[in-house]
């Protein structure tokens, strides 16, 4: 089970960027190998937060379509928020959203994470 962070979807559907192809290749490889990809409703909210204020509705729609097509989407539960709070002392460099991603992963037994955020990836491995 692989948790897919918001930035993977953003790079996959976004403007030209050095991480665009690695994001797309990861998603294609996962699809070919029938990897179980998961994410959370919080990741979808992050897409809204990134694209709505700048009027990039078409990109938002593409990203949301990709999320729904390729991943199992978890709700964020009160227990996830409570666990995120307990993780803050171990990972003070993570923001609230990444703490929530980490909490969702830990509570559901995620074995791998795909993110281009080195801080989140490091916290996941620790």
UniProtKB/Swiss-Prot annotation:
Listed transmembrane segments: none
Keyword Magnesium included in the entry's annotation: yes
Domain PINc per the UniProt entry, residue ranges: 2-118
Disulfide bonds: none
InterPro entries: PIN-like_dom_sf, PIN_dom, PINc/VapC_TA, VapC_family
EC number annotated for this UniProt entry: 3.1.-.-
Entry-linked HAMAP family: VapC_Nob1
Name the UniProt record assigns to this protein: Ribonuclease VapC23
Native source species: Mycobacterium tuberculosis (strain CDC 1551 / Oshkosh)
Gene: vapC23
